[in-house]
Amino acid sequence: MGASATNSVTHPAFTLNVRPDNIGIITIDVVGDKVNTLKAEFADQIATILQQAHALPKLQGLVIVSGKPDSFIAGADITMIAACRTAHDARVLAQKGQSILAQIAAFPVPVVAAIHGACLGGGLELALACHSRICSLDDKTVLGLPEVQLGLLPGSGGTQRLPRLVGVSKALDMILTGKQIRPRQALKMGLVDDVVPRDILLDVAIQRAKAGWLNRRALPWQERLLSGPLGKALLFRIVRKKTLAKTRGHYPAAERIIDVVRKGLDQGGPSGYEAEARAFGELAMSPQSAALRSLFFATTSLKKETGSAATARAIHRVGVLGGGLMGGGIANVTATRAGLPVRIKDINPQGINQALKYTWDALGKRVRSKRMRPTEQQRQMMLISGSTDYRGFERVDIVVEAVFEDLSLKQQMVADIERFGAAHTIFASNTSSLPISQIAALAQRPEQVIGLHYFSPVDKMPLVEVIPHEKTSEETIATTVALARKQGKTAIVVADRAGFYVNRILAPYINEAARCLLDGEPIESVDNALVDFGFPVGPMMLLDEVGIDVATKIMPILVEQLGPRFAAPPSFDVILKDGRKGRKNGRGFYLYSNPTLHSNSTKNSSPTKNGNSPAKRNSFKWRKNKVKPVDSSIYTLLGVTPKAHLGAGVITQRCTMLMLNEAVRCLDESIIRNPRDGDIGAVFGIGFPPFLGGPFRYLDSLGADKVVQALRLLVQQYGERFEPCQRLVTMAEQQQQFYPVDANIDEVTDVAS
């Protein structure tokens, strides 16, 4: 790796080693943390390191590397914002970051960033301030500016340096979406100067520093054209229009990003940096950013929990009962994310083949985009095998059942696993409606039976519900949560009652939307009202995507166990008798010229297949909703004459108030353990607007008294189903909130119910 160092300076997170060839190596290694993040106190340390390097008369260059195995810099420490009480405080924080990175940019000898692992947010802004960037050709290496997903913008110069480096259109795309860029793509767009194998990364970076100042690569002609007055004006007009169409005005960070980038290009760097810091300060104090950051911290804290006081049993092999889309999706995330061998059992070879094809196609997309080598695709596929019998299940630690929603069938599956599996094998049912206690009723080892409810498509939806019944052991809970985490899922533990949590709060929302339709409101008016409110798709479109038959199957169970407030309007029976199942058979609320026979129509389909994933650790993800024509024959079928008359506000209030009320009931009945889990479940499971933070944070923002008042007015207008639950009434009377009023969002990880 080269000559040994002759001089070194160490600070808590930064070490400067000067080699005999006069190249300084600055190593970033935040003590006690698994990944590097930039903290406020590091500003002085960086300044001191740079001053000491500047004082070395023979210094030829600097290389910045990470001391962590697979992390360059994962971003700035978001908890810094919690210390900011005003927009001015946050603005000063941004200005301090700008000042430090300006010192790197102005350093008199070349500074090279040697990037391996995550280089995100403030980490990429630091790399952009360097004079050259070399990154490793490794799956763990990604570059991006994800601040928009937290309701912020890059505050340390990212909005100004990136457009000048890669061009304004590519920069806007990166910053507005928060997307992560892979090494080859980063090289192609000019974000990095070279991509090399990890084992020679430092050597190549040192040679680049020795080479002295290099000419900056010219922008492609398309980007140069867009930098001109006419091209720039056209580009920003198009970008602003598309942004507003996607965000519906709910995410002010996106609009501020456009403004700040434009200002820097029009008025020069100083004006751009000043606008960036000011916008960062104002956005940091916005309710949208507070809500999005609360979701980030909530998911982060949840990932550290086991769901139980027990220690999880080691998982070496996983079984899946049932092929098809759901079984294939579960096998896919188990093999490709958890890295565990999977054995699929189906009654016929076609089901197994379909499950195998699911993963082969998913990995094939990565191969075609050069994000994976064909040999790696083959290696991961070898983790999945299948059979029409139970051979191999004697070595399986946990079995995930994904067969039809038939109680006797699932009970038979439990008996089979107890017969053919190991004595310790856990049986996890992917049921969406059947009580886990009934599935375990005939089990010899009921303590090893649990619910594990995935949402479809499994490889895209981040949430799972873990459902223990009264006899489930603590070890079984901990082991099931551990599997979900290995699969890259965010798991919430919920009680074994009808609908669990997600489907239970979704059902009244769907029912009320259907009642609005029966009141004569056009389908598109209902859907547009809820999309404008912030949901990714409207309830009618949702029913078509999930499958009208699938989505309404749980309603009778909810009525039987929870009461008449869950009774579905008669429209569903009429629609189903007409053979309308939604997109999967080309007949639903909307017209489909080319129905997809294998759309998200499995029993556990999610309300939004593009759900909000923080994950990519974040809670805001843009969606492209294709406008489909309404099937107007459905109005004749239902005997209604469509006419917009309710207004978007009334539609939204009727649907969302029922969802909020039911969420509070779930908390009161201990279906969920705390408001945090309820917020995560709603946002990641049904697409509740992330910028509102989830049902419970939204309730706090409205005030319990205002919500109770609104519900009582709705009772007078529409009936007893809007009666506010007692927990909500009590909170209104005592002026209580679900989250502590004076707590910073990063300090609130849960609130006891």
Curated annotation (Swiss-Prot):
Where do the record's region annotations for Disordered lie? Answer: 593-622
Q: Where's it found, cell-wise?
A: Cytoplasm
Swiss-Prot/TrEMBL site (Important for catalytic activity) positions: 125, 147
For whether the record's keyword set contains DNA repair, the answer is: no
| EC number of this enzyme | 4.2.1.17, 5.1.2.3, 1.1.1.35
Which InterPro entries does the entry link to? 3-OHacyl-CoA_DH_CS, 3-OHacyl-CoA_DH_NAD-bd, 3HC_DH_C, 6-PGluconate_DH-like_C_sf, ClpP/crotonase-like_dom_sf, Enoyl-CoA_hydra/iso, FA_oxidation_alpha_subunit, FadJ
Q: Which reaction does it catalyse?
A: a (3S)-3-hydroxyacyl-CoA = a (2E)-enoyl-CoA + H2O; a 4-saturated-(3S)-3-hydroxyacyl-CoA = a (3E)-enoyl-CoA + H2O; a (3S)-3-hydroxyacyl-CoA + NAD(+) = a 3-oxoacyl-CoA + NADH + H(+); (3S)-3-hydroxybutanoyl-CoA = (3R)-3-hydroxybutanoyl-CoA
Task: Cite the residue spans of the region called Enoyl-CoA hydratase.
Answer: 8-197
Could you mention a single GO BP entry for this protein? fatty acid beta-oxidation
Residue stretches of biased makeup (Low complexity): 599-614
Named in its record, the pathway it takes part in is: Lipid metabolism; fatty acid beta-oxidation
Q: What's an example of a GO molecular-function annotation for this chain?
A: enoyl-CoA hydratase activity
A GO cellular component term found in this entry reads:
cytoplasm
Q: List the disulfide bonds.
A: none
User: Which portions of the sequence form the region 3-hydroxyacyl-CoA dehydrogenase?
Assistant: 313-747
Note whether NAD occurs among the keywords: yes
> Main localisation, per the record?
cytoplasm
- Quaternary organization: Heterotetramer of two alpha chains (FadJ) and two beta chains (FadI).
What this protein is reported to do is described as: Catalyzes the formation of a hydroxyacyl-CoA by addition of water on enoyl-CoA. Also exhibits 3-hydroxyacyl-CoA epimerase and 3-hydroxyacyl-CoA dehydrogenase activities.
Q: Which family does it belong to?
A: In the N-terminal section; belongs to the enoyl-CoA hydratase/isomerase family. In the central section; belongs to the 3-hydroxyacyl-CoA dehydrogenase family.
- Protein name per its UniProtKB record: Fatty acid oxidation complex subunit alpha
